[in-house]
Amino acid sequence: MPRLVWLRDHMQHSDTLAQWLHQQFAYEFIEQPLADWQREFAAGQGNGDWQCLIALENDQLLGGAALAANDLPERPELSPWLACVFIAPQARKRGLAEQLIEDICAATKANGTTRLYLHTHDRNDYYAKRGWQVQECFEAWGKEQWLMLRDL
């Protein structure tokens, strides 16, 4: 049974998750080499920029989701963000993404925040079914994006 834990307490998985994210969202990292992103992501576990919750099973990393201080530089007035949701292919179809997302939402609410944002180019229907609302559509990285929010 997978357990959800904070990456800051299991930093041996930071570089792997950062690499998965760099590959999955390559269009967002065109100007940022992997090593730079790995350093930023690891530092973010301590400074609050990228507070990541991960799924582990027998100390094997299955995926993660982050609470990001700023995930869309063009919209600095919006914060915080659900970001970096990724499940390894072999661990999909087990409900892990939804568990991670709901736990990020619960932790955010427990800290007194009442709204979360996200952006997606291909999962707006998935998030809409889980209580997220489209705030606007925009183009970034050559793709149509949906800016979504969820009141907690």
Could you describe each region identified by the protein language model?
Residues 1-16:
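Conserved N-terminal entry element of GNAT/NAT acetyltransferase domains
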Residues 11, 18-32:
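Helix-loop element at the rim of GNAT/NAT acetyltransferase active sites that forms part
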Residues 26-54, 62:
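Active-site rim helix/loop that mediates acceptor-substrate recognition in acyltransferases
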Residues 52-54, 60-70, 81, 86:
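Conserved beta-strand in the GNAT
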Residues 85, 116-118:
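Conserved hydrophobic beta-strand within the GNAT/NAT acetyltransferase core sheet
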Residues 87, 93-106:
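Conserved acetyl-CoA-binding loop-helix of GNAT-fold acetyltransferases
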Residues 114, 121-144:
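Conserved active-site alpha-helix within GNAT-family acetyltransferase domains
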